[in-house]
Structures are given as C-alpha cells and as structure tokens.
Amino acid sequence: MKQILPIDVANIKELLMINAFDEPVTLNDLLFACFIIERLSRRIHRSNLYVVTNIKTEGITYLLEFATTLHSQNFNQTCDEMILEYKLKNGKIVKPEKPSDLLIGNVYSELIWKVQQEDLVQTVIDVYNSPICKVIDNYKTLAYLDPTPVLVNAYYNKRY
C-alpha cells in the first residue's frame, strides 16, 4: 500500500513560478506569453526565436508575471510597448495569417508546459531555441497540428 505523505505548502511555492500578484503562473498565463511572442514575431516580420532572444529573461518574466492584467489590454498596445522597450527591429519574414497567432501560441504553451523543469522562463527559452521549432514554424509541414505528445517526443529527441 502506498504511503501518502503530507504536502508541505511552503515547498510547493518554491516549485511554482509566482506572478506579481503572489499567485502561481498558470497554463493560461503561459498561453498569453506565447501568443504575444507569436504576435510580436508577425508584427515585426521576424522569427519567434528572434523575439525570445531579444526580450530575454526579463521580457518573458514580465509577460508571465503580468499576464493576468496584460490580457485585458489591447494586444497590439502590449506588442507596441514591447517593441519599444526591447528595441525589436523589423525583418523580412512574412508569415501567413493562418494558422492564427493564438493557435501557434497554444501549440508552444502546451509543449512548454509539458516539458518544463524547475524554471519556467528558462524552459520557454529552451523550447524556442530547440531545432523542432523550425519545423513547427514551417506551416507547410503541418507539425503545429500534431498532438502535444508527438511534439514533446520530438523536443526530447531534438529532431522532428
């Protein structure tokens, strides 16, 4: 018979990322952050990797910590503020309107949520730097439609 150990709430807090309002960061907060990363990449015609690399840990942390309030703000305003704050430059990549930025944000958030270790922000950076992201971002491959377990497996194998 399995022994059930009491849960030490103080230690759980150390395992979770806590937002600016002293609440755990949720999957919805992560979805918002990934959606804004995708929307930014489309607005400035650059890859998601460019956005993640340039907003760095600080920008990703900001999106996750304030997602509960930022989602009430106009998304384009959030993007405009981040473009100015992190000096994001326009590029030449033109992404199609479909799949939507929300759908791609959902694909990334589900993948990140499943593979996260201790540091959620570092996991975001690691996933966007993974070789499989080039496959996911090539919409002709339709990889973004694959079930999350397939993407998780590809992430751990470092190839699609």
For the regions a language model picked out, list residue spans one by one.
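Glycine-rich, aromatic-bearing surface loops/beta-hairpins
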Residues: 129-160
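N-terminal interaction modules that seed assembly of large macromolecular complexes
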Residues: 19-83
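Long, compositionally biased
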Residues: 5-15, 68-101, 155
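A general marker of short, structured functional hotspots
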Residues: 28, 82, 104, 124, ...
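Alpha-helix initiation/capping motif
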Residues: 56, 86-87, 147
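Amphipathic protein-protein interaction modules
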Residues: 86-134
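Alpha-helix capping and helix-coil boundary motifs
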Residues: 47, 74, 119-123, 146-147
